[in-house]
């Protein structure tokens, strides 16, 4: 048993909470709460990222026959979110532990000030021995402001909470060399130090659970958290004492090792914030950014996707679509469209103003 206190984010997907059925599996949730409470009592800090609001809403309303629309999903989430937090509160109260609900959207994470506010709230809950229960605010989130899935949300929560480890609980034991339900020769991959393209291909062929996130989104989450120095473990939610094993460092599931030299807090935000748009760059800019550590100049920009403001985080991509870097843009999308392909000396002439010679400065950039 490790003596030092750890901060652990536990992400529970819909498949874990329902056991693959239409109802929330309360007995299983109680067991997971027992494990969390046990570690909480030992001085560890636990953060819950929970799915299941839509499933809880559907169950509470008696499985209504609703059209498969965004409005119907948001209706179910609005009804179910209160039921879901009541369950967590009820089960943690068995052990005398309070919970605090945090509902987040992408907008809370891509704006630096709101990111810091969310971080301060999360830290205040942890400092007061309250277990944060986090979910995406599905009742109000639109496609433009959704993080997209709770795997990536849990990685962002791990960054917000300064976590040591992120545990992604699912319905299989971890990442396999192939889908174990279709291939009897599939083998569990116990440890990962680098998320290669080959590994992404393996994950892309593997489906996990009934929710929005499969194994591919879990690899995305592992990449985000790993860059911040956070270990990520994918494991089966029904494995006995899985949370204790993760805290104690026992081999379980697939462990993705975080970087030994994690990025500073500002760069954690840059890498963690969902991009507000994309900048497509030419081969020269790609080489300058990836091999020389240079800033992005307007001259190297070929295309801009999306609408974003100055100071927002954007994704820089190659002509082939490869994710090269994330960074804080010094010009808004409209201005970039005007100066793209031009020399920096022409910025003031084209726009009538300038915020410097670069579109994204290397100090405000994280290379992927």
From Swiss-Prot:
Pathway: Amino-acid biosynthesis; L-proline biosynthesis; L-glutamate 5-semialdehyde from L-glutamate: step 1/2. Gene3D superfamilies: Acetylglutamate kinase-like, PUA domain. ATP binds at residues 11, 170-171, 212-218. It is found in: Cytoplasm. It is an enzyme of class 2 (transferase). It holds the Pfam family PUA. Substrate binds at residues 51, 138, 150. GO terms for biological process: L-proline biosynthetic process. Catalyzes the transfer of a phosphate group to glutamate to form L-glutamate 5-phosphate. Belongs to the glutamate 5-kinase family. This is Glutamate 5-kinase.
